[in-house]
A protein has these predicted regions:
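Conserved N-terminal glycine/acidic-rich loop preference
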Residues: 4-5, 19, 46-55
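An amphipathic, aromatic/His-enriched active-site/gating alpha helix that lines ligand/cofactor pockets
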Residues: 25-35, 51-87
Length: 98
């Protein structure tokens, strides 16, 4: 069953391009990864949305995702509220519309 993960980020002022470039370098060849999009949700705010063939593939890729994050962690601001620099969520698709 298809799964998605999303991660919310806030980038430090003036470091947006560096943040985006770090993702371009990854071009993740991870098993089960089907598509990745980064959306800009506000000034310095971004969300990454990734589609996976199944939840097991997503779970197996978590160490790679963390290693990737470590490569650009210094470009991120703390989100506050005890979240740290990311706000990740993931899960299987339970309803597909168009």
């Amino acid at each position: 069953m298809t799964a998605f993960n999303t991660v919310r980020f806030r980038v430090k002022p003036g470091r947006d391009q560096e943040f985006l470039e770090a993702h371009k370098k990854v071009v993740a060849d991870w098993p089960g990864l089907q598509r990745v999009n980064i959306i800009k949700t506000g000034d310095g705010s971004y969300c990454i949305v990734a589609e996976w063939s199944d939840m097991d593939s997503l779970i197996a890729a978590r160490p790679n995702m963390i290693a990737t994050l470590d490569g650009f962690r210094d470009t991120l601001e703390d989100l506050g509220g005890g979240l740290g620099v990311t706000d990740p969520v993931s899960g299987p698709v339970v309803l597909t519309l168009k």
